[in-house]
Regions:
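Acidic/histidine-rich catalytic cores and adjacent linkers
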Residues: 2-13, 17, 23-27, 46-214
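Short, surface-exposed amphipathic charged segments that create phosphate/polyanion-binding patches used
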Residues: 31-42
Length: 214
């Protein structure tokens, strides 16, 4: 969602409809929630020994914050060392959210936006963005909401389209993996050939190679 990117696309493809990949929408609010959790967590870092326990809980169970609330286990009880008792994931989240009202409101908006994205509900997504009261949210989530407001027309295209750059992202990650496994390539053409071999069964060779016939 880089402004420079959109400007360049408009110059090159003036009639194109821009679709923002859904992954980047989720990533934006995901990071905002995580920043909120960390800031809340740090307020307990230098507090009393009793409050410091909440610091460790907020740090330890960060993955639960990013989980869809419907996926939190509310039936299975496990012993959690920091709580010193058997408890469910839902109960852990209820406790952690009770520590800070701003964190709770930010988390709830995050979950609501995730739900609308999953259900492909653009009107619901838009209403959440436009009707959210800023004073109830963390500064990081407020910034993310302003970004989403700015891109609402493009976000609408996202909900109306099935396009995604997931395949391209997967290819890029595969290429990076090839390079990492080989600890880098000194010869570009060897690197290129290895990539092409991984993505195709076609016979390839070094276009700069010299061929001699007897």
């Amino acid at each position: 969602m880089n402004a420079g990117y959109f400007k360049r696309v408009k110059e090159l493809f003036p009639n194109a409809s821009v679709v923002i990949d859904r992954f980047h929408l989720v990533q934006l609010i995901n990071r905002a929630l995580n920043v909120t959790r960390i800031k809340t967590m740090n307020t307990y870092r230098t507090a009393s020994p009793a409050a410091a326990k909440d610091y460790r809980k907020l740090k330890r169970y960060w993955k639960l914050f990013l989980k869809e609330s419907n996926d939190l286990d509310y039936q299975t009880y496990h012993y959690y060392r920091l709580f010193k008792k058997v408890i469910t994931e839902t109960e852990i989240m209820d406790y952690l959210l009770s520590l800070n009202s701003q964190l709770k409101e930010t988390y709830q908006l995050y979950q609501d936006l995730l739900y609308c994205s999953k259900k492909n509900d653009y009107e619901g997504f838009k209403d959440l963005i436009l009707m959210t009261k800023k004073h109830e949210l963390s500064p990081s989530m407020e910034t993310s909401i302003l970004t989403l407001k700015k891109h609402l027309p493009r976000i609408k295209n996202t909900f109306q389209s099935t396009l995604s750059n997931g395949s391209l992202e997967g290819s890029i990650n595969k290429i990076k993996l090839i390079k990492r496994i080989a600890y880098g390539y000194r010869n570009f053409y060897n690197y290129r050939d290895r990539i092409l071999l991984s993505f195709s069964d076609k016979k390839i060779g070094n276009e700069n190679a010299m061929v001699f016939a007897a």
